[in-house]
């Protein structure tokens, strides 16, 4: 780990202290943008947002940037993470590879359609949690709001406790809104380092209930696979009809920088400027979007590129707070809330307002296409660089889950794009 190869060395990105205040200030400044128009520009994307009093003419809507999702083409994933005192390495790897893991799903298509991605997050084994709840907490239900998942993940702190795997699997099985459709991919990934059989809830019972709902439970041991604990985690995977992995939680995540990362970062900044908050929580959620960019970038520019790739996909939707996504989902809501928008928008006539939305939407799609092109080039560069490197495969959380996802999606009839 950490060897240099040619002009593009691999880098081990250390964890940095993260302060949100500067980013919240940036979010506030972004939210005060009052006039958004399109002007031709060089560099990232075909468009650049600028302040001007003119209204750009509406352009013909471009073709969709990616395959559309359907309700019958869904992937649901719950991550159950041990946050007892010995699990700092596990949580660090989860933070470092969240966007890389989600990016694997973006490569999947079935019948030419991209899947909808829903993610849930639990943590367990933490002494700050209530013992009557089994030291377990649901941090997020199944949701398409991946920024919320990232926010909860980056807030996790470890603290010693008792780890009850059967209990947390049972809670995830019972509490989450799992799709009843057999075509939906339903996966649980549980990671920890103590015996899988601890606690009052028998693991075999919880796993049986999950299997009854078509949920596949995969187990990830952070430790020696050849000891007694390894046997219990293997047995858990067998009963859960899933896969067993073991990882070295202390192994540092290795990033391969690329010549495309800087351009991707610039595109991402411009993409953010196409988001206009709407509703009572709009400004706060816009600030969270920027905060999660900062969290991703705290692990390096290459990691931000992985997040930008997801943000450029059809799975990144923010209808709850973004003007454009809200208009796509419910135009009547936008009209009702129009007067709460900045004067540069609220004072426009209906025709001018629709022109503005169309222009802004075209700018976003242009930037998304640009990011997709750049990240595809980046992926090819990284893969070629990795093939040139010698050594063993990565034994980290992200690498194991990514490989597992590819295998499972192929089994369910998905095609994985290169």
Each language-model region and where it sits:
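Composition-driven recognition of long, C-terminal low-complexity regions enriched in serine/threonine
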Residues: 12-13, 29-32, 212
């Amino acid at each position: 780990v950490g060897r240099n190869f040619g002009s593009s060395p691999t880098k081990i990105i250390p964890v940095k202290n993260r302060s949100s205040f500067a980013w919240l200030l940036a979010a506030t400044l972004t939210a005060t943008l009052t006039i958004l128009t399109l002007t031709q520009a060089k560099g990232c994307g075909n468009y650049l947002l600028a302040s001007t009093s003119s209204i750009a003419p509406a352009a013909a809507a471009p073709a969709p940037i990616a395959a559309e999702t359907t309700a019958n083409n869904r992937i649901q994933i719950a991550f159950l993470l041990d946050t007892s005192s010995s699990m700092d390495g596990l949580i660090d790897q989860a933070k470092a590879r969240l966007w890389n893991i989600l990016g694997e799903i973006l490569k999947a298509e079935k019948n030419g359609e991209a899947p909808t991605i829903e993610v849930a997050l639990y943590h367990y084994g933490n002494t700050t949690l209530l013992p009557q709840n089994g030291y377990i907490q649901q941090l997020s239900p199944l949701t398409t709001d991946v920024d919320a998942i990232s926010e909860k993940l980056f807030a996790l702190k470890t603290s010693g406790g008792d780890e009850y795997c059967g209990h947390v699997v049972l809670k995830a099985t019972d509490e989450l809104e799992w799709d009843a459709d057999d075509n939906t991919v339903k996966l649980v990934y549980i990671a920890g380092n103590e015996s899988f059989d601890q606690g009052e809830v028998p693991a075999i019972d919880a796993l049986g209930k999950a299997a009854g709902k078509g949920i596949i439970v995969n187990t990830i041991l952070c430790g020696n696979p050849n000891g007694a604990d390894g046997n219990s985690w293997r047995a858990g995977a067998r009963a859960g009809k899933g896969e067993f992995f073991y990882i070295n939680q202390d192994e540092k995540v290795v990033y391969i920088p690329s010549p495309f990362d800087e351009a991707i970062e610039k595109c991402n900044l411009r993409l953010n400027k196409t988001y206009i908050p709407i509703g009572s929580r709009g400004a706060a959620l816009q600030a969270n979007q920027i905060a999660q960019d900062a969290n991703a970038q705290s692990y390096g520019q290459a990691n931000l590129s992985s997040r930008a790739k997801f943000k450029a996909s059809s799975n990144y939707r923010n209808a709850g707070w973004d003007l454009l996504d809200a208009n796509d989902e419910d135009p009547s809501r936008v009209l009702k809330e129009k007067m709460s928008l900045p004067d540069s928008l609220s004072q426009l006539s209906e025709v001018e307002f629709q022109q503005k939305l169309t222009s802004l939407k075209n700018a976003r799609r242009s930037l998304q296409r640009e990011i997709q092109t750049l990240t595809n080039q980046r992926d090819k560069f990284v893969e070629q660089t990795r093939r040139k490197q010698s050594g063993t495969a990565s034994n980290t959380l992200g690498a194991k889950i990514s490989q597992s996802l590819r295998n499972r999606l192929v089994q369910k009839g998905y095609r994985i794009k290169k």
